[in-house]
Amino acid sequence: MRPAAIAALVLAVAVAVGWREARSPTASAAPVAHVRPTAGRPAIVQRPIPFGAKRRAEMRAYARRHYGIDDFHLRTPKVIVEHYTVTDTFQAAYATFANDVPDVELHELPGTCAHFIVDKDGTIYQLVSLTIMCRHTVGLNWTAFGIEQVGRTAREILNRPAQYAAVVRLTSWLRCRYGIALRNVIGHNESLSSPYHRENVASLRRQTHGDWTHTEMTPVRARLGRYRCAG
């Protein structure tokens, strides 16, 4: 067989083999990169609680007593604290925070509050400006956003897909917007282990609550880790 004919035959065989491999269901394909979702701003309903001059003055006095900070502004947010309301409705939790009365536990002013409440159906309500301190976690109010979730246990919230997803979206957006490390997204029960915990009142230095333990927060932080910050 002439060299030209041999070359043509080899080329034909190579093309045929390549065509069969391309059609083969077992042919290797380039791996598809998994793209993590971006932590964009979720839909937020504005339902501000009264936070006028009187309450701001009370918050300023509270910050002086507990943190040595003569200010009511939240200037350096480094922590996000997750809570649950121990109520069955948004309205009940909202009423508690809107009433600027001494809390039943520590009997201090201003009244307790949180920056957000996430309802059972996943609706996100903002109650307080992100530039103002709220009383939600002893030792961390000076540097923490508070997110309350309507419910009585962490298990309830983890088992409500819409509410759980909304909590993750809101927390991811806040975390990315303010450059808050994932390790600093904590449950209220984890407050004493935060490197940002500070408390000038000696009797309150070990004070915390039972909501959102380390075990309960573990799947939440894992899910938050799936989101990437834009930019």
Question: Where do the language-model regions lie?
Answer:
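Basic/polar, cationic surfaces and motifs that engage anionic cell-wall
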Residues: 19-56, 153-231
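Solvent-exposed, acidic/flexible segments
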Residues: 75, 109, 140, 156-164
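Short coil-to-beta-strand
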Residues: 80, 138-147
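Short, small-residue-rich loop/turn micro-motifs
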Residues: 86, 149-151, 189
